[in-house]
Amino acid sequence: MTTAASHTARYPGDAFLEATVARMIRSKSVHGAILCVESGDGSLSWRGAAGNLRADQRYFIASVTKMIVTVVILRLRDEGRLDLDAPMQRYLGTELIRGSHVLGGVDRSDQVTVRHLISNTSGITDYFFGKGPDGTNAGDALLQGNDEAWPLERVVDRVRTLKPRFLPGQPGKVHYSDTNYELLGRIIEVITGSDVADVFDQLVFRPLGLRETYAYRDPDDTSPAPMYYRGRPLHVPKYIASVTAEGGVVSTAAEMMTFLEAFFDGTFFPPATIDELKRWNRIYFPGQFDYGIGIERQWLPWLMSPFQPLGELLGFWGQSGAFAFHNPQRDLFFTGTVNQLSGFGHGAAVSAMVRVMKATS
C-alpha cells in the first residue's frame, strides 16, 4: 500500500520508492517492511509497505520510544523541575538504587546523574542483555518466548547481580543500557506525579494529534503487528506492557514521522538544543555508530557513496527493527520498521535509506 507522492525532480519518484521498500524484504529475516519518507520542505511525502505489513499498520517502535523520553526529560529540565547534573538519588531515593553500581567493592550508585542515564554513560549494565553469574541474560529468555513482566524493582534487582561496565561518567566510555531508561521513566513519574504513559500522552501524543500512538499497557491488545524473531512471530505482551520508558510505545510510520519532524523542527525545544544533544560517544568500534544525549547517530562512511557524501542519520533504532532518522545533509526524514528482533533486518533499513539519499540530489 502506498500514498500518493507529490514531489519535484529533485526527489525519487513513486516507482523508485516502491522498488526500495520491496527490496527491504529480500532478506530472509524480513517478512514485512514499512517505509515512510518525507522532505523537510514538504515536497516529498511517501509511504509504502511490502510483505506481510500494511503502510498504515500499527507496530512496536521499541527503543525509538527513548526519543520520547528525551523530549519529556528536556521539557522538565527547561521548566526547572529537573537538573540533568543532579544525582538520580535526588529523585529516586537511596533504597531503590542502592547496589545498582558496585565496582571494585564500592557502591557508586549515588554518583550516577540524570545526564549519565540519558547519555548511557552511567556504567550501569543493561539488564536485558547483561549476563549474570550463571551466564544467562533476560533477553535470551524473552526471545525464547518466556513472556514475563519486568517492573523497575525487578530490573534493579537483576542489575545488582551484574558488574558495571565503567565508572559513572568515565571519559570516552558509553554502554547502551535499557536500565538507564527504566530509571529515567521512574524519575519522570516522581517529578510529575503521573504514570509515564500518561505523561507521554499529555506532553507528546496529544499536542501532536497522534491518535494511533500510545504506550502499550494491555497484554490483550493485539492491534499492533506481531514482532518476528528470525522465522517466527514472538509474542511478549506482558514484557512490553511493563517497560514503557525503555521501549513500550506503539505507533504508525505516519505518526512517527509527525513526531520525528517535530523533534528536529523546534516544536519541543529550541533548535539549538539539538546541538546540545550531539555529545557523541562511539558505541560500536570500528563501526560508525554513536550515542549522544538521548539520540543516536549512524554515520555513513564515504565508502557507501564515494562521489556523493551521504552525511549522517540522527534519530533512533529499535530492537524490533523500527527506525526514525533525519538526514540533515539532504533534509530527509525516514520512519518505519522491518519488524525483526534478531537484528538481521536493520541492514535492510539502512540500505533503503541510503538508496533514497543517493537518489536525492
Predicted segments — roles?
Residues M1-A19, R26, H116-A149:
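Extended low-complexity intrinsically disordered regions
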Residues P168, K173-Y181:
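Aromatic- and glycine-enriched pocket-lining scaffold segments that form the walls
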Residues L35, D41-G48, Q89-R90, G132-P168, ...:
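Short, charged, amphipathic alpha-helices and their helix-cap/turn boundaries
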Residues A55, F60-V64, D78-G130, T161-L162, ...:
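Active-site helix/loop module of the DD-peptidase/beta-lactamase fold
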